[in-house]
Swiss-Prot record:
UniProt xrefs under Gene3D superfamilies: 3.30.70.20, Electron transport complex subunit B, putative Fe-S cluster
SUPFAM superfamilies in UniProt: 4Fe-4S ferredoxins (SSF54862)
Domain 4Fe-4S ferredoxin-type residue range list: 108-137, 138-167
The protein's role, per its UniProt record: Part of a membrane-bound complex that couples electron transfer with translocation of ions across the membrane. Required to maintain the reduced state of SoxR.
Residues the entry annotates as binding [4Fe-4S] cluster 1: C49, C52, C57, C74
Record protein name field: Ion-translocating oxidoreductase complex subunit B
Cofactor(s) this protein requires: [4Fe-4S] cluster
EC number(s) on file: 7.-.-.-
Domain named 4Fe-4S: residues: 32-91
Length: 192
């Protein structure tokens, strides 16, 4: 019985020693991040779609903050994100890339043909925003509220049952930005 307590005590002691060493090392050798990069990364939509030419939002934020990359390359964020980054960096706003300069940009949505889906989960693994739900060997579907239309789920599908379709804007599907809609308070006379 004593050997069990000795083993438990030794493992506890080793855990505490190695934990203290790791705690010291994490503080001693910590790399400070650039606060500007952190702020730019917080502004970006975190869709990790790669449409900007970088593998995710963090590398794009580092390129903008440290290497002077153009601030107008985030397609999912569009003009709103570009204006926030321009304000943060105190630079002139730039026109969005050619794809973004359409008169009325069309929101795209991934659609799965559920009759041909084999439930391989490759699309789920490829989706950067977890907009696809389903289980192995079961039907998958796309949650339209979360899908950014980044096109990353289309190529991994072995049965080619995923396609991007334009979303028809209706009052139910429209993203109402209540901060930009002017609100006027109309005085109302109260009668007794």
């Amino acid at each position: 019985m004593n050997t069990i307590w000795i083993a438990v005590g030794a493992l506890t002691f080793l855990g505490l020693v190695f934990g203290a060493i790791l705690g010291y090392a994490s503080r001693r050798f910590a790399v400070e991040d650039d606060p500007v990069v952190e702020k730019i990364d917080a502004i970006l939509p975190q869709s990790q779609c790669g449409q900007c030419g970088y593998p995710g939002c963090r590398p794009y934020a580092e390129a903008v903050g440290l290497q002077g990359e153009k601030i107008n390359r985030c397609a999912p964020g569009g003009e709103a994100v570009m204006l926030k980054i321009a304000d943060l960096l105190n630079v002139e706003p730039q026109p969005c890339d050619a794809e973004e300069q359409q008169a009325a940009p069309v929101r795209m949505l991934a659609v799965i043909d559920e009759n041909h889906c084999i439930g391989c989960t490759k699309c789920i693994q490829a989706c950067p925003v977890d907009a696809i739900v389903g289980a192995t060997r079961a039907m998958h579907t796309v949650m339209s509220d979360l899908c950014t239309g980044c096109n990353l789920c289309v190529d991994p599908c072995p049965t080619h049952c995923i396609e991007l379709r334009p979303v028809n804007e209706t009052p139910d599907s429209w993203k109402w930005d209540l901060n930009t809609i002017p609100v006027r308070i109309i005085p109302v006379e109260q009668h007794a």
